[in-house]
Every structure is written in structure tokens, then in C-alpha cells.
């Protein structure tokens, strides 16, 4: 019989097979996993949802600030805009998955699904960090080296860059915790 397996699994400890007692080693492992993952912002948890919403909001603010600037022809700023759009889409998609997992009371413990989360978080974190660093370098050049902040909205650039770094920081936390979860599956 061909039956598909769900990507989300029930939350909780599975019962012992065949009415047999769970060996002490297994009980200790289950307790350790419960203690390690309880309250951590992992995929499918309320903390994970809050982390994803924080990533989304900070990337959205960075995007909104960059869009509100009339003229930005520097490549680093265009890259920041593209990276924040990608970050918004990725964080929003995973927030929707977290909401679904919370509504159906399921845990996202599938190794394939978690590995996709890890790779996606790693890629978006790298892109967001690179874009924020490149944009910060351009703002330092404009503001400090050639003193052109009077004709350029440096404060808006700085606000967008700060929000991009905040988004990167939250994605990095998510990446590390999800990678740790993948290593323990």
C-alpha cells in the first residue's frame, strides 16, 4: 500500500512499541531532546514564528526605507533592495509554515524539511549580510570620505542598513538553531 508521509509530525513523545517499556537510555535521550528544544525558537514553535516575524518586519522596513528614497543608482543599494525583498519572501513563507504547524499542533521535525530551512536561512543570511555591508561601505564613503550627505539622504540609508543588519542577525539565530536541530535529528 502506497501511503505518503506528512512533512509535519505530531508533537510529543511517541508511545512505546508493543506495550514494552522504554529502555533507560531511550528515556534519557527523549528527556534531553525535550529539555534542549523546549522554549527554543525552532521551526513550528511560537518562538520560531516570532523570530520569523521579526525577520520579516525588519527586512520590510529596510525595503520600505530604500523604496522611499527617490534616487539611488549605486549598485550596493540596488543589491540591498533585492536582498531585503528575498528576505521578506523567505521569512513570510516560513512564518506561514510555522502558523500552519502551530494550528494543527504538529512539529516540523522532518530532516528533509529542516535541511531546506537550513539552506534557505544560510543563503538569505549571507545575501542580506553582504548587501548590508556593501551599502554600509558606500554610506561611509559618501558621508565621511567625500562629505556628500547634504545632497544624499544618508540618514535614510543608515536606517535601512541598520534594519538589514537586524534582519541578518535574526536570520543568523534561526540558521544556527535550525542547523543544531538538524544535527540532532
Swiss-Prot record:
The keyword Transmembrane helix applies. Coiled coil: none annotated. The chain crosses the membrane at residues 49-69, 77-97, 122-142, 161-181. GO terms for cellular component: plasma membrane. It is a multi-pass membrane protein. Its main location: membrane. Residues 1-48, 98-121, 182-185 are cytoplasmic. Pfam families: CASP_dom. Keywords: Cell membrane, Membrane, Transmembrane, Transmembrane helix. Residues 70-76, 143-160 are extracellular. It is found in: Cell membrane. Homodimer and heterodimers. Belongs to the Casparian strip membrane proteins (CASP) family. This is CASP-like protein 5A1.
